[in-house]
Each structure stands twice: as C-alpha cells, then as structure tokens.
C-alpha cells in the first residue's frame, strides 16, 4: 500500500471510487474511499487527509457542501470537485468556495493527477 499523502475520495458511485483510488495509488498516493460525506466526517482518518476529491451530486450532502462544512469547522482541506452534470452556477459556487479544481466527468487521469498535485502544494503551503 502506498505511503504517500492521504487523499479522501467521496462519491456515491462505487466504480468511480475504486477507479480513482487505483489511479491515485499507482501514482504513489494513499487513498481512502467513502460512499457518503457523513462517512468521511465520522472517520478517524479525517485528520490525516491532505486532499479531498468529492462528487458534486450526492444524497444528503453534496461535495460542495462537504467542502464548506470542513472550512466552517476549521478543517479546510484542499478540495477537488467532480461532476457529470456541470453548470455555470455550481462552477461559480465552487470557484467562490476556493476549491482547487472543478472537473467534468469523464476527465483524463493526467488532469486529475495534476489537480491532486496542486492540492498537495496548497496543503503544504497552508501548513495543515
């Protein structure tokens, strides 16, 4: 198992979670997957997360709401949001919320990895 920085993946689609986890681990990152935002928030691993990748559309709490909740709780984690249903309103909300990247599914593996590296730099600079 990779020993690199921990990336949390929150998506209600199991295939997306598994594929993203495999990609990140092959690039040297550690990854933890969660089907719901609440599962991440209850996890003991939350304090170790260096980057969050979350789906915009999930039941109960969206990826953007999760990001905003973490920021409001003084647990700001550099966040990458992904969606299969892009629209200008949610993209503007994501930018205003200072997410690292807003990815439209399907996206290239290199695009996601570039966003993760950017998030890691932001995490290191922020001293989290």
How does the language model describe each region?
Residues 65, 86-101:
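Alpha4 helix (beta4-alpha4-beta5 surface) of REC/receiver domains from two-component response regulators
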Residues 35-36, 62-66:
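Acidic catalytic/metal-coordinating carboxylates
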Residues 33-51:
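Acidic, metal-coordinating helix/loop segments flanking the phosphotransfer/catalytic sites
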Residues 89, 107-117:
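C-terminal output helix
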Residues 14-32:
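Two-component/phosphorelay signaling modules centered on CheY-like receiver
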Residues 117-128:
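The C-terminal output helix
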Residues 58:
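Receiver (REC) domain active-site loop signature in two-component systems and cognate sites
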């Amino acid at each position: 198992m990779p020993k690199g920085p921990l990336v949390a993946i929150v998506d209600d689609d199991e295939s997306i979670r598994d594929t993203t986890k495999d990609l990140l681990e092959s690039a040297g990152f550690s990854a933890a997957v969660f089907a719901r935002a609440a599962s991440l928030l209850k996890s003991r691993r939350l304090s170790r997360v260096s980057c969050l990748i979350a789906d915009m559309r999930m039941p109960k709490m969206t990826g953007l709401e999760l990001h905003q909740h973490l920021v409001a709780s003084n647990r700001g984690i550099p966040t990458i949001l992904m969606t299969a249903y892009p629209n200008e309103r949610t993209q503007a909300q994501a930018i205003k919320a200072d997410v690292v990247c807003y990815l439209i599914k399907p996206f290239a593996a290199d695009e996601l990895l570039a966003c993760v590296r950017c998030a890691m730099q932001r995490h290191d600079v922020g001293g989290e």
